[in-house]
Amino acid sequence: MTLQRTFVMIKPDGVRRRLVGEIISRFEKRGFNILALKMVHMDRATAERLYQEHKGKGFFNELINYIISGPVVCMIIEGDDAVSVVRKMIGATDPKEASPGTIRGDYALSKSENVIHASDSEEKAKTEMGIFFQDVTEIGAQARM
C-alpha cells in the first residue's frame, strides 16, 4: 500500500441535494484523511482548465455549464492507495453502470449529474489539486499539526 493524495470534488447537484456530509462521512469511515476542503463557485476558465481533456467533445459545453451552475466542494483526500480506492468508492460515471453502494450508484441522477469527480491518476491528482489549492506541499504539514 502506498500513501497517496487525490483530488475529489462534490459537484453542484451533490451540494444542491445536501449530500456533502454523507459523502465526506463515507471517505472518513474508509479511513481517509481530509487534508483540505473548500466550497467554491467555479468560473468558466477554471472549469475549462479542470476538464481540458474533454475540450472539443460534444458534451464539453454542457459539462462546463453544469459545473459552473452552483457551488462545488473541493477536497484533498489522503490515504492508502487513495487514487484507486476513491475511484472504486465513487463508481462508474454512468449511474446505470455504477454498483449499488458506490457514491454514484446510490446518488447519481444521470451521466451529467453524477454527484462527484475524483482524479483518475496520481499525475492528474497533482494537477487538479494545484488548480484549487495553490500550495499543496504546505497542506499536509498543516493538517497534521
Swiss-Prot record:
GO terms for biological process: CTP biosynthetic process; GTP biosynthetic process; UTP biosynthetic process. The lineage of its organism: Archaea, Thermoproteota, Thermoprotei, Sulfolobales, Sulfolobaceae. Major role in the synthesis of nucleoside triphosphates other than ATP. The ATP gamma phosphate is transferred to the NDP beta phosphate via a ping-pong mechanism, using a phosphorylated active-site intermediate. Its cofactor is Mg(2+). Its EC number is 2.7.4.6. ATP binds at residues 11, 59, 87, 93, 104, 114. InterPro entries: NDK-like_dom (IPR034907), NDK-like_dom_sf (IPR036850), Nucleoside_diP_kinase (IPR001564), Nucleoside_diP_kinase_AS (IPR023005). This is Nucleoside diphosphate kinase. It is found in: Cytoplasm. CDD domains: NDPk_I (cd04413). One of its GO terms (molecular function) is nucleoside diphosphate kinase activity. One of its GO terms (cellular component) is cytoplasm. The keyword Transmembrane does not apply. Keywords: ATP-binding, Cytoplasm, Kinase, Magnesium, Metal-binding, Nucleotide metabolism, Nucleotide-binding, Phosphoprotein, Transferase. It catalyses: a 2'-deoxyribonucleoside 5'-diphosphate + ATP = a 2'-deoxyribonucleoside 5'-triphosphate + ADP; a ribonucleoside 5'-diphosphate + ATP = a ribonucleoside 5'-triphosphate + ADP. The gene is ndk. NCBIfam families: PRK00668.1 (NF001908). It comes from Sulfolobus acidocaldarius (strain ATCC 33909 / DSM 639 / JCM 8929 / NBRC 15157 / NCIMB 11770). The keyword Phosphoprotein applies. It comes from the Archaea. Belongs to the NDK family. SUPFAM superfamilies: Nucleoside diphosphate kinase, NDK (SSF54919).
